[in-house]
């Protein structure tokens, strides 16, 4: 994996509050190597470690994107949902930002069936077929379509399991992380001071509660993907 420069600035991370962890009573002792201090009852993350692992993650994503790999970004925490969607769309990644349906990856055949149903309903709506149905039937299909859009809208173009999964909040999306571990899908995960740093392939110590922090980390990661995709297109 080639090391590159990703303009990861400690001052910028401080301004975004990346270094603020959880209260000292609510922490995982395994995070001790990633904590630099305690301040006013909260743990402070060592941003030098954050920069190191963020850089490693960017290198991995660049190399994967350069090889034409596919990515999934998972962040179902309400406050992060919009940032996850916009970052994923910018980098042409799949995303889940509402709810991780249990078995979404480990029971991929069921997910494929749901996705095909979703695509069929979208095609019928686009062709105006749903509106020509009796009102009751049309209303039922529209509700079904709305539900599918909410939970599967970000993965509607997925045709197989992703090559790498980025997870915004380990605690919130633990099920997604465990499914990736079971399937051997490489993971990049933001970890706050209450997380387990040993679960993901690359764990990035960072504040997973502040929008500014989440957005900054995601921006770096998707920039690396975009750069990798550009390299892939140039070298094809």
UniProtKB/Swiss-Prot annotation:
Main localization (coarse): plastid
Keyword hit for Ribosomal protein: yes
The keyword Plastid is assigned to this record: yes
UniProt KW keywords: Chloroplast, Plastid, Ribonucleoprotein, Ribosomal protein
An individual GO BP term: translation
Alphabetized InterPro entries for the sequence: Ribosomal_uS2, Ribosomal_uS2_bac/mit/plastid, Ribosomal_uS2_CS, Ribosomal_uS2_flav_dom_sf
Highest taxon of the lineage: Eukaryota
Molecular function (Gene Ontology), one example: structural constituent of ribosome
Cleavable signal peptide: none
Compartment(s): Plastid, Chloroplast
Cellular-component GO terms for this entry: chloroplast; mitochondrial small ribosomal subunit
Membership in a protein family: Belongs to the universal ribosomal protein uS2 family.
HAMAP family documented for this protein: Ribosomal_uS2_B
Name of this protein: Small ribosomal subunit protein uS2c
Source organism: Acorus calamus var. americanus
């Amino acid at each position: 994996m080639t090391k590159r420069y990703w303009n990861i600035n400690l001052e910028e991370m401080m301004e975004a509050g990346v270094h603020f962890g959880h209260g000292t009573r609510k922490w995982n002792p395994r995070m001790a190597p990633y904590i630099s201090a305690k301040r006013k009852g909260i743990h402070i993350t060592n941003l030098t470690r954050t920069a190191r692992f963020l850089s490693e993650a960017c290198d991995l994503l660049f190399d994967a994107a350069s090889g034409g790999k596919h990515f999934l970004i998972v962040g179902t925490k309400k406050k992060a949902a919009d940032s996850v969607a916009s970052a994923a769309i910018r980098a042409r990644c799949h995303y889940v930002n509402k709810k991780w349906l249990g078995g979404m990856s480990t029971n991929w055949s069921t997910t494929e069936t749901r996705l095909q149903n979703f695509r069929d309903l979208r095609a019928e709506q686009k062709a105006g077929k749903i509106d020509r149905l009796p009102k009751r039937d049309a209303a039922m299909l529209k509700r079904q379509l709305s539900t599918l859009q909410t939970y599967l809208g970000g993965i509607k173009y997925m045709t197989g399991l992703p090559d790498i999964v980025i997870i915004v909040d380990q605690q919130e999306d633990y099920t997604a992380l465990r499914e990736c571990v079971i399937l051997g899908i490489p993971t990049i995960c933001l970890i706050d001071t209450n997380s387990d740093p040993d679960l993901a392939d690359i764990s990035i110590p960072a504040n997973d509660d502040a929008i500014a922090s989440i957005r900054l980390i995601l921006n770096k990661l998707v920039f690396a993907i975009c750069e990798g995709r550009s390299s892939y297109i140039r070298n094809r």
